[in-house]
């Protein structure tokens, strides 16, 4: 998953406004950071997406993106 695909998946799953809020504000305990901070720290977009889906109860959206 590329960074651009991460953000496309966020918007497709949560919508533009809520998706941006989740990425910047929702603390993902398993990563010890928000999604934005985890990505900036070098965590793979795929791992961040998996944790975001789990934290928000949207495991059904886990595979909305393509696999490399």
Where are these regions (language model features)?
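C-terminal alpha-helical interaction appendages
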Residues: 1-68
